[in-house]
Structure formats: C-alpha cells, structure tokens
Curated annotation (Swiss-Prot):
The cytoplasmic dynein complex 2 is probably composed by a DHC1B homodimer and a number of D1BLIC light intermediate chains. Interacts with FAP133, FLA10 and LC8. One of its GO terms (cellular component) is cytoplasmic dynein complex. It comes from Chlamydomonas reinhardtii. This is Cytoplasmic dynein 2 light intermediate chain 1. InterPro entries: DYNC2LI1 (IPR040045), P-loop_NTPase (IPR027417). The keyword 4Fe-4S does not apply. It comes from the Eukaryota.
Amino acid sequence: MAAPAMLPGQAVKTPGSIWAKAIEHANEERKKPGADGRGDAFCYFVGSRAAGKSTLLNRFLYPTRAEVPKPSEGIEYTYARKPAAFDHEKKDLAHIWEVGGSQEFAEEIVNSDQLFLTAKQVTTAVVVIVVDLSDPAGVLPTLLYWVEQVKKKLGSTYEKFEKKGLQLPEQLRQRAKSKLYSANEDKDTVYHSGISLVIAATKYDAFKNQDPEVKKVMSRVLRYIAHAHGAFLCYLSGLHGASEGSGAEDAALLDNFTRLMNHLIFTGLEKKPVLKMQPQIDHTGPIMVPAGFDTFKSVGRPRSQGEGTVAGGLAEWRELFEKMFPGVREKEAKMSAKGAKFVIPEQYKEEEVDAVRQRKVTDLENFRKEQAAAVEAAKKKALMAKAQQAEAAAKKKAGAPAAGAKAPAKASPNGTPPRRPSNAGNQ
C-alpha cells in the first residue's frame, strides 16, 4: 500500500520510515481550518415532558435497539465517540445531555454558567428541540419557549466574547450563513444562531391520521419557525418499534436523523450536511426540511402572501394555530408558572428517604425565608440611617441644632455671661 502523497514543498520533520512521515502529514492536515480535527462536541436534547427525548437519544446512540428507557427527571449525561482514522489518533468525543424534569429545573440549567451553550461549547454546539405531535396544542409553546431560551443564552455568551473585542460570534453566524444559506433568497432575513439547531417532531405515527388541513397548519408553522431560525426540521415516528404498515418509512426517518446528527456533532457546520433522504415538504406525509432548503415564499402566510416582517408572519401563523389547536394559551401559562414542584414517580417512592428529603426541603425553605427577612431588615435599617443623616444635614444647613445636641446658653441683656445654677441648696 502506498503512503499518502505529500504536496510539493511540504517539510516533514519526523525522521524514520515513510509511515512515520505519513502519520505526521495526516496530523498536520487535521490541524488545518475546516479539517476534521475539531474539539469536543456538546449536544443538548431539550423539550417538553413525555415528548420522547430519552427514546430518541437512545435510538440515535443505538439505532438497532427499540428499548423504552425510563423517563428522565433532571439532567442526564452520556457521550459518544467517533472511531479515528488511525489507531494513534484521538477519537472525536461528543458530550450529550438530556434536560428533563420540571420547567423550573430546566431554567436553572439554561441559566447556569457551567452548562448549556457556554463560551467553551458554542463552536461545536448542537441543540435538539423535541416536540410531541401527539400533543398538538403543546407543540408551539414548547418550540417557542426553547427557541427563545437558546437565543437568550447565546446572546449572553456572545456578549462575553464581544466585550473582549473577539469576533468569534460573528464568525459563527457567518459560518452558518455561508454553509447553509449561501444560495437562499432569505439569507439576510433568517436569524443565524451560529450553532446547529434541530427541531425533532416525534410521535408522527399518533398524528398522521389527522385531517389534512390540520396536518397542513402544523407543518407550515413548524417549517416557518425552523426556517426563520436556521434550523433543521425532522418528523419521527415508531421510535418504540416499527408502527403498523410504516416500518420502512419509520426506519428511513430515523436513519436520516441519525446521519444528520452524526454530521452536526462530528463534522459540524464547516461542511453542509449531505443527507440520504430528499427534502419532504408535502404535509400529507412526514416532513423533513434541511436548514437552508425552505423559503418564506414557499411556506407562505395565512393572510399577507409572504410579505411583511418575520415576526408578523409568525403572529399570523400563531393565530391560525391557536384556532386549529385549542389549549395553546393554557399550555403556555402552565409552562411560565413558577414554583413547579418536583414529583416523584410512584415506583421510586420510599417513605424514609422521602421523609428525610421533605425535612431538608422544609429546612431549605425556612432558611430562604430567614435570609430574605434578614435582607429586608438590613434594607430598612440602611434606609432609616440614610434618612437620619439627611435630616441632620438639612438642620445643619439651616443652622438648627441637630437632634440630641444642646442649644447654646443665651447671654443676659447687659452682655454678661449667664450665671450657672447654684448647687448650694443641694449641699
């Protein structure tokens, strides 16, 4: 077998056999911009409860397994490796998190300085927003909530770079724009996040028998939001096993999703993904739209025929979506409600452990109340002290004695100093 050819003028520093030189050449190639030698990837699976995040992640990691994993409560971590081209090379590593549990917990993760789209992660970050087609009214609130969380966290992370005068945020945005939208007529209108964003609409098998008009509105809304935010859109079904009469279709959808994720995680946006499945925008079947394929004109708008702002188009689609799927507002209100309690599933309950936990929770709540009361008392004390200082300053300025000070003794009419009271009677 012949060794890889060297380019003219390339210096090889490693002495020894031709294979040692070939290895050095391969390593140098990996260090070049756009080569496969990337840093670790960081991937997050987020979305509503019971949307199938755990199942989808399990099928991505183990495509041939149709096991039903336990529901996730909190955040779960796993990783994936890509085999290296040579035995001596470092394998590409992807850190993968699934964010589950309550909405309040999810917000804690999103707002953490150590997790979710940190400065270290944004260059190779992938976010998969999982929405549940078997709960149509919850699709739009879930999707808009997580899109907003991604944008908010990226904004704060990018701001840290920009304050230091670094151009990385703009470079990431331009990378996404040039690789995915270079030939798209909406390239200057789309929000380019700079990261890989995927919208995975699961449980299509529970939605596919809906009225065609219902399916049309759902597909158009998802396509509009995906295109507006530079995201990939994939319908998925049969994740627990092939659904009746749709085994080949389910397998093709999963295979396409797996190929897409492997590319985004281990290659990234340095190269445009090449997928085996052709884009599918027919609402009568499962939708699959790569980022950069759609246009606002193709998606259309309910009233204004594609004219106007992106926000205006979203408002029109939202209005139609709410009419088609009652309960959207209630879902949003539930998602935005604070103080959601962590609920322990029945099969995991243990009386002694739960009692100890409840005591700890109560102690924590009491401690927080005491801390809040102490802070409030300190604020009141500071305000009172400030008011007294202001009063004293005002009296001093007016020439009046400050509170607690003795007034000077008045002189007698003839100018002699006042006599002190005699203490003789007391002696």
